[in-house]
Curated annotation (Swiss-Prot):
Gene: IST1
Entry's Gene Ontology molecular function annotations: ATPase inhibitor activity
GO biological-process terms attached to the record: endosome to plasma membrane protein transport; late endosome to vacuole transport via multivesicular body sorting pathway; protein localization
Protein name: Vacuolar protein sorting-associated protein IST1
Cell compartment(s), UniProt: Cytoplasm; Endosome
GO cellular component, one term: cytoplasm
Miscellaneous: Present with 4760 molecules/cell in log phase SD medium.
Disulfide-bond pairs as recorded: none
Motif (MIT-interacting motif): 286-296
Function: Involved in a late step in sorting of cargo proteins of the multivesicular body (MVB) for incorporation into intralumenal vesicles. The lumenal sequestrated membrane proteins are targeted into the vacuole after fusion of the endosome with the vacuole. Regulates the recruitment of VPS4 to the ESCRT-III complex, probably in conjunction with DID2, and VPS4 catalyzes the disassembly of the ESCRT-III complex.
Chain intervals for the UniProt region annotation (Interaction with VPS4): 251-298
Length: 298
């Protein structure tokens, strides 16, 4: 089959699947580099090269922002892949804006086209741009790249890196120092200040306490009692609530049931007595029979 005869939906599906694979691979590669960079920063902190570690952390922050961008672009590709048939029905930019502002298709297409210049490791995005230029028009693609038309602000920020704030760099350095157990001057200062605050909290006793609760007795109350503790018994301990395991043996049995139980026991005793009498009579008869048999033999 000639390339020109391949349907647009098949081209778009193939391109999006390739973009997803490349974006995932780029994320994994970038994460491995970031992990190695953190170890290098920890080594610099260990050798007291904090200024050099500071600059390395700035690069590390830019790498993390780039990884976030790759993750967002992957989600956009997944969204478009799930809605290829819907995209196939789009023919103009006006239709794209009018019908697909709320379902995410307009945002995803513009973001992927705009990010082409900032994601060099995914060449398949340029193929996606060409497909969109063929489907809608070239002016649409050029307007997105040059004028940022309807491109989300979060994508523009992640594609235009700036110098990170000092607080963010310090936070990264502190976390790396904690993770790899290496010294960092600002981390030690923060730990010493927090420990001094804790010690001051414990060293300042409140002057309002006059009585010593340790000398006062402890009062044990029933669990169902609503009595509150008084001044003599500031500490109260509730007894365990009665349940099937700790219930007392002193149960009140109704009179009717009690009568039936007593009568039943008495009848059982009588039957046992009757049985014993009958057994005795049978034993005596057996003995007499044995004696008569013995006399006959003689």
């Amino acid at each position: 089959m000639a390339p020109s005869m391949i349907p647009f939906t098949i081209k778009l599906k193939t391109c999006l699947k390739m973009c997803i694979q490349r974006l995932r691979y780029a994320q994994e590669k970038q994460q491995a580099i970031a992990k190695q960079s953190r170890r290098q920063v920890a080594q610099l902190l260990l050798t007291n090269k904090e200024q050099k570690a500071h600059y390395r952390v700035e690069t590390l922050i830019h790498d993390d922002i780039h990884i976030e961008l790759l993750e967002i672009l992957e989600l956009y590709c997944e969204l478009l892949l799930a809605r290829v048939q819907v995209i196939n029905d789009i023919s103009t930019e006006e239709q794209l804006v009018k019908e697909h502002m709320d379902d995410g298709i307009n945002e995803a297409i513009r973001s992927l086209i705009y990010a082409i210049l900032f994601v060099d490791e995914v060449k398949e995005l340029s193929q996606l741009k060409d497909l969109m230029a063929w489907k809608i028009n070239v002016e649409f693609v050029n307007g997105v790249i040059a004028d940022h038309i309807d491109v989300p602000e979060k994508i523009i920020k992640k594609c235009s890196p700036s110098v990170p704030k000092e607080e963010l760099v310090d936070l990264y350095l502190k976390e790396i120092a904690k993770t790899y157990d290496v010294p960092y001057s600002k981390l030690e200062n923060s730990l010493s200040s927090s420990s001094s605050n804790i010690s001051s909290d414990f060293s300042d006793p409140s002057g309002d306490i006059e009585d010593n609760d340790e000398e006062k007795p402890i009062l044990a109350l029933d669990n169902d009692d609503n009595d509150n503790a008084d001044a003599k018994h500031p500490i109260t301990v509730k007894k365990p609530r009665q349940n099937s395991e700790n219930i007392k043996n002193e149960l009140k049995i109704p009179k009717d049931i009690k009568k039936e139980v007593i009568e039943k026991k008495q009848s059982e005793k009588k039957t046992t007595k009757r049985k014993t009498k009958k057994e005795q009579e049978n034993d005596e008869l057996d003995e007499l029979k044995k004696r008569f048999d013995a006399l006959r033999r003689k």
